[in-house]
Swiss-Prot record:
GO biological process: biosynthetic process
Top-rank taxon: Archaea
InterPro entries: GTP_CycHdrlase_3 (IPR007839), Nucleotide_cyclase (IPR029787), Rev_trsase/Diguanyl_cyclase (IPR043128)
GO function terms (MF aspect): GTP binding; GTP cyclohydrolase IIa activity
Pfam families: GCH_III (PF05165)
Entries under Gene3D superfamilies matching the protein: 3.30.70.270, Nucleotide cyclase
UniProt name for this protein: GTP cyclohydrolase III
NCBIfam families on file: PRK02240.1
Length: 266
């Protein structure tokens, strides 16, 4: 089981134009700061956040309890000119978990409802014995094939086309895909295997002409899984395997319950 938290800014659209439209550079900086904060605060408890649309953030939160969510929510209220709502859900796949979490927030009203503030709810249950599977995907030799040859914008366009195709293919497996900078994508993919990725990469190569590789990490938390995925990708980059997909799994001994202060100050 994977645990997902959906974070949504309350009544954000109307706030950006009240009493007058706010300066765009300030709004962009504010959104980026919130995303940074969510990664730092969830990351302090071994979670991982993705910006999606900036006013809606998706986080992997295995091992993070309700009280910690509340502390993060209060921290936003104390330091930002708006509040956020949060819903937590767990499921066998990342797509299903975020679907349940999104539905839970939507049941409280519209994202632009001025009376809906600081929702904090749990769709089903908190994960105690689940796991997180993450794939760190990147483009083969983007520097030699795109960055050093094409314009900055054309390279960006190629990366965005690849991202869209990757996201569409991942959704077929009830998995998610997020752009994390450069030519890199992080994909919550509980339930997928190496063969699934190889088939998917072949389809993307045929349609986009882009070759991909992936390190897959399986761990107790998002931090554990992402670290292993990063190591797996380095194994491929260093030519230590012939495959374009390499999986590393956290050892059982490492997953035993150990004291961890989930309630530490944020």
């Amino acid at each position: 089981m994977i645990q997902i938290t959906v974070v949504q800014i309350d009544n954000y659209g109307p706030w950006t134009v009240t009493p007058n439209p706010r300066r765009e550079s300030d709004l962009q900086a504010l959104q980026s700061r919130l995303y940074c904060d969510m990664n730092l605060q969830f990351g302090a408890h071994k979670g991982l956040a993705f910006y999606t649309r900036f006013d809606n953030i998706i986080a992997i939160t295995n091992g993070i309890d309700l009280e910690t969510h509340k502390r993060i929510q209060n921290s936003v209220k104390n330091r930002y000119p708006f509040t956020v709502s949060m819903a937590v859900a767990s499921a066998e796949t990342a797509y299903e978990a975020q679907k349940l979490a999104t539905k839970t927030i939507q049941e409280y009203g519209s994202a632009q409802d001025d009376v809906r503030k600081e929702v904090l709810d749990v769709a089903n249950e908190f994960v105690s014995n689940g796991y997180v599977q993450l794939a760190h995907v990147d483009i083969n030799d983007i520097t030699g094939k795109l960055t050093d040859l094409e314009t900055a914008y054309d390279t960006y366009l190629s990366v965005q086309k690849t991202k869209l195709k990757l996201m569409e293919e991942l959704k077929k497996y009830d998995s998610l895909g997020f752009f994390i900078g450069g030519d890199n994508f992080m994909c919550p993919c509980n339930g997928m295997n190496e063969k699934d990725f190889l088939c998917m990469f072949e389809d993307i190569k045929d349609s986009c002409g882009i070759e991909l590789k992936a390190g897959i990490g399986i761990g107790k938390t998002a931090e554990d899984a992402s670290n292993l995925a990063d190591i797996g990708l380095e194994v491929i980059r260093e030519g230590k395997t012939d495959s374009q997909v390499y999986t590393l799994k956290q050892e059982i001994d490492e997953q035993k319950n150990v004291p961890y202060n989930y309630m530490c100050p944020i």
